Amino acid sequence: MFQNDFDDSFQESADLTELIEQFEKSIEKEESVFLDEDALQRIMEYYEMRMEMFKLEKAIDYALSQNPYSSDFIIRKAEMFLHKKKYADAHAWLDKAALFDKNEIDIYLVRADIFIETNKLQEALSVLLEAEALTDETEKGFVYAEMSHVYELMENYPKALEVLFAAIESNPENMQILEDAAHLVDMTEQYEQSATLHKKLLEKNPYNWMAWYNLGRAYAGVNLFEKALEAFEYCIAVNDEFEYVYRETADVYFRMDDMKKTIEMLRIAQEHAPEFDDYSYKIGVCYERLEDYKNARFHYRKAIRTDPYYDSAFYRIGETYRVEERYDAALVNYKKALKLDEQNEDYLATIISVHRILENTQEATTYMYALVYSRTDVLTYWIELIQALYENTEYDEALEVCAEAGLRCGNFAEFQYLESMILFKMGKERQAMIALENALIKDFARHTILLDIDENFYHHQKVRQLVELYNK
């Protein structure tokens, strides 16, 4: 049986090759050779699959020269104009197709595509509603799928899912429509509704592997992990070449905190898509969770070999070294990550933390400035920088940063409290008390920042007297 299937496939491929050669020779020699409509469609599909658009257009024009009244070929011509973004010409050719077969569903689908590309979503929807009235139950699935796409572009996700579910019920064996459902279910969190629909599909056809996959995702969405794993197992039993099911199975095991099973599933997924560098990274995360830092680093580096700009992988390598208290090695990798994403707040904050552990005061301050300027709107970053300068007795600089913070971040009372502390340390007691009084008037509740940063200042007699005065 297998040999017969192979022979048929081989013969079909040989026939297509011969057909393409015959067509290309006729074009080259400018000879007209009659080809039936089926042969012409096969030629077009061949060029379309290979994205050879110039040759595809030649094939369409050739087909039209022999079949000028064929609505199929006229629609093909309209699609070619759509590809070229010549929208008026595309509409004109669709109008021509309608003269020969006004009920042809593809006329409406291609016209909707034109409206979608030109951001005329309401017009696209109107065309598809017209098409819905003309189609039989099987064709309705394609119309509903296109409608779902329009609603999604309109950001009406519940309606997009509702229509897509209708498409699935009309055409339950269409894998593309089933695949589209997965992300819409996640966006709308309609997991129970998805589970109900896909169970109904599986009652009719238990070999529908995409339905098993979607059912598994629905169960995972409501944390029914054992049921999700069972559904994924059925999916694999029917189609063990489907890469995404291994990824989703791995994700469920990860959420169950079973790192060893997660790694096992990720390895299988990686066999199906070795070019996907994220698998090595994910395996690294699992080993890191298992506190096997050497293996974690091995897989992070493997991900980096595939993608040298994988900043997250450099960062995770740094984290494994930090846990082992190998701070210099950690910093090397943190800085590589930061070089690839220069304003990443997590990277900057971690580098600051390590420099503080190593008591590299100047380096820590340098990166604190970088953190502040990466997000000038974050109050806590300014406070931490001013506090660091204050603790390093760099009072003049701390005072300048207070003024800059007020301008860049906002006129927060915290900056006035910090200013009062700095002025006091600089021996400017009168100015310090004025700044403190202004801060207390502005926002008394924030005065506890004084206690957090300098307990001695907070308990100073004059400070206590002023605080008590405004403690109403």
Question: Where are the predicted features?
Answer:
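Canonical positions in the second alpha-helix
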Residues: 63, 96-97, 130-133, 166-167, ...
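Start-of-helix register in tetratricopeptide repeats
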Residues: 38, 72, 106, 139-142, ...
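Structural marker of alpha-solenoid helical repeat scaffolds
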Residues: 66, 99-101, 134-136, 170, ...
